[in-house]
């Protein structure tokens, strides 16, 4: 894989979508992307055509349709397998840049730390699902669970967003542990949008300016 794969992670309400929008405006003219290459922005769940259908199943807030924790894990895995096969791998092999709103570490945080599914089981599944795709750099936009809930107070929540604060706390602690690995950059998402954006841009320039 020759392109660059960037992932934005964090609990709901941390501003991932906003920052990806900022990057999509800046990156094409940043000098980082080689001539002839493109920028692809995507998300999980729902980055592929099949994924959009799976997203509806996963996030449906009808309590009568609530999947078991294991079924939820496998739905996310199916979404990711299709996402990697149809979107991520072809783009990277074409020298394109891919920025994804969530990837496999969200599954570790939400289904592993949040749902208490054995982490080794998840890692084994992901080793198959990801098909060798691994982020070059992951940004963790960190906010407190309390701030997450406050920011989303006027929104209609999906099923995952409807979980209580204890679930969010477990997920957030999971992200903090995962973010200790290399190729992660932790940024406080309590700052204003432009400050966060500038920190992301600076990190990208520092990491990839010599790879043009």
From Swiss-Prot:
Protein name, per record: Thymidylate kinase
Primary role: Phosphorylation of dTMP to form dTDP in both de novo and salvage pathways of dTTP synthesis.
SUPFAM superfamilies per the UniProt record, alphabetical: P-loop containing nucleoside triphosphate hydrolases
PROSITE patterns: THYMIDYLATE_KINASE (PS01331)
Gene3D superfamilies: P-loop containing nucleotide triphosphate hydrolases
Keyword hit for ATP-binding: yes
UniProt cross-references to InterPro entries, sorted A to Z: P-loop_NTPase (IPR027417), Thymidylate_kin-like_dom (IPR039430), Thymidylate_kin_CS (IPR018095), Thymidylate_kinase (IPR018094)
Gene: tmk
Entry's Gene Ontology molecular function annotations: ATP binding; dTMP kinase activity
Family (UniProt): Belongs to the thymidylate kinase family.
Binding site residues for ATP: 10-17
Swiss-Prot/TrEMBL GO biological process terms: dTDP biosynthetic process; dTTP biosynthetic process; dUDP biosynthetic process
